[in-house]
Amino acid sequence: MLKFHRNVKPQFGAFARYSSLGKHNSRKRVGIIRLAYGLTGIGLVGLAGFAWAQDRHEKTYQKKGVQVEGPWQFYVLTTLPLRTLSRWWGYVNRIEIPLWMRVPAFGLYSKIFGCNLTEADPDDVRQYKNLAEFFTRKLKPGARVIDPDAPIVIPADGKILNYGVIEGGQLEQVKGITYSLDALLGDEKLARLKRSHAIPSPDHIPHIRQEEFAKLNGIHYSLQDLMGHDHGERPSHVKDASAQHIDLLSSTKVAAKSQFTLFGSRETNCLYYAVIYLAPGDYHRFHSPTDWVVERRRHFSGELFSVSPFMARRLGNLFILNERVALMGRYKYGFMSMIPVGATNVGSIRIKFDKDLCTNQFGKLGPVGTFDEAVYTSSSSILHGHPLLRGDEVGNFELGSTVVLVFEAPADFEFLVKQGQKVRVGLPLGRVVPSSH
């Protein structure tokens, strides 16, 4: 018995040493894990601080102007680095996804947000290399039918947030919350850049002469235009035309007073607006609402708040605080403007025919209300702008966002949509009711 105990004792001692060593290694592993968590936390705090510093650096030159209006919680949003985070999200969007992950990843996203992949072109999600390609997917031919008779058609898939007549220069964001038309479209005096864009006419209308395009769509042009330079040449007056061109903003200011003088407008015309919200699961490209000529674009650098219906009901001045691009021109009934608005994680707004436009770029923001402006007058010596046919693709977002339409139309124009209605590209937005006399 004594011998047995003597044999066991060393074994127990060895076990104790191994147990002690195991505890030491365990404590070491816990220490390493804690260190990793600590470094990760420090890194995240550092990244957040860097993002905040970037946004603060960009906003250095912003002066007091249009302010956030809403509960105190929304003022907290102004301190968040939404522009930088959206820029980082754009980088993530372009990371190539491994082939084996695409079906489950895009399938899960489609299920959560209700994407209709049967109408996508291509409908095989394995062909989308990254999130950006998936978000900006095209539709199969014939997936959207463009109404040939409506004066204005729906420019994007989404939900109607609001619509109506612009009165007193104010648009209604939601009931009880309005924002200024002048602030939405900009003041000519606040332009930071003017330059002429020589953009060739669209490839899909080479068989239609520019004069015919103008006549068919009721767009006025002068005899001097018709006898002027051939398309493709740069007229000597383009520079002056770019600098001295009739200020389209004056059309909106006059419109608010029912005193229309621009583009042959009549005093019986009114100014209307419509706001379409694109959810994350919607088709992300937007199209021309009518046959019109785009004369200029104004790029407003700004915030990137969410533009969801929840935010629209609570945050005043939402669409004039956010980054946006205002395309402005004329159509059959007068003034026309299409304004794609950026949002959180949707800093990138692409305009198909304007490759020089870059949104949500790093750099200091100018004073509130200022914008970069480019004119398209040298695109056509006849039309003095870039022609678009109804249904033409205009551009895209990289995630859900909002499109605002501001347009002139006769007083007997009536909307064919309802607030909160789900709509698709090409459906009629409204009609002009035939006069009874």
Curated annotation (Swiss-Prot):
Keyword Membrane (UniProt): yes
Keywords: Decarboxylase, Lipid biosynthesis, Lipid metabolism, Lyase, Membrane, Mitochondrion, Mitochondrion inner membrane, Phospholipid biosynthesis, Phospholipid metabolism, Pyruvate, Transit peptide, Transmembrane, Transmembrane helix, Zymogen
GO CC, one annotated term: mitochondrion
EC assignment: 4.1.1.65
Mitochondrial intermembrane side, ranges: 58-437
InterPro entries: PS_Dcarbxylase, PSD-B, PSD_type1_euk
Reaction catalysed by this enzyme: a 1,2-diacyl-sn-glycero-3-phospho-L-serine + H(+) = a 1,2-diacyl-sn-glycero-3-phosphoethanolamine + CO2
Any one Gene Ontology BP term: protein autoprocessing
Obligatory cofactor(s): pyruvate
Transmembrane residue ranges: 39-57
Function: Catalyzes the formation of phosphatidylethanolamine (PtdEtn) from phosphatidylserine (PtdSer). Plays a central role in phospholipid metabolism and in the interorganelle trafficking of phosphatidylserine. Together with psd2 and psd3, responsible for the majority of phosphatidylethanolamine synthesis.
Family named by the database record: Belongs to the phosphatidylserine decarboxylase family. PSD-B subfamily. Eukaryotic type I sub-subfamily.
UniProt name for this protein: Phosphatidylserine decarboxylase proenzyme 1, mitochondrial
Natural source organism: Schizosaccharomyces pombe (strain 972 / ATCC 24843) (Fission yeast)
